[in-house]
Regions:
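Short, glycine/serine-rich, charged loops/turns that create anion-binding
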Residues: 9-12, 41, 96
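Secondary-structure boundary/capping motif
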Residues: 13-16, 45, 80-81
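Short beta-strand elements in bilobed, periplasmic/extracellular small-molecule ligand-binding domains
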Residues: 31-41
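Helix-loop-strand module that forms the ligand-binding subsite of alpha/beta enzymes
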Residues: 53-106
Length: 106
């Protein structure tokens, strides 16, 4: 069975993107395990000295590294992604690179 991390790319509790990931998790359960991950608890990116990454980001990176792929469900705000997702991606590319050579579906 394949294992995926499903990033909920918004902090809205009523998001259609959240519902989409929940639908995928339920309806593809026999073929893949999809762990839904909230990103609204990640601190604002601030480029800290010594490239110290917050523990919550390190934990997320470990989940991504262990997964077979990543599914990002995100709304589009003003022709871009939400700030909460941009923030998470900034941390996930600051000295750690868990998504390199990892299949990602948006």
């Amino acid at each position: 069975m394949l294992n995926f991390v499903g990033l909920i790319g918004t902090n809205s509790k009523e998001s259609n993107n959240r519902r989409l990931l929940q639908f995928m998790q339920k309806h593809f359960a026999e073929k893949a395990a999809i762990e839904l991950v909230e990103i609204d608890n990640i601190p604002l990116f601030n480029k800290p000295a010594k490239m110290k990454v917050p523990e919550v980001v390190s934990e997320l990176a470990k989940k991504i590294e262990a997964a077979d792929g990543v599914i990002i469900a995100t709304p589009e705000y003003d022709h871009s992604i939400p700030a909460v997702l941009q923030n998470a991606l900034a941390w996930l590319s600051y000295g750690i690179f868990p998504m390199v050579n990892k299949p990602v579906m948006i």
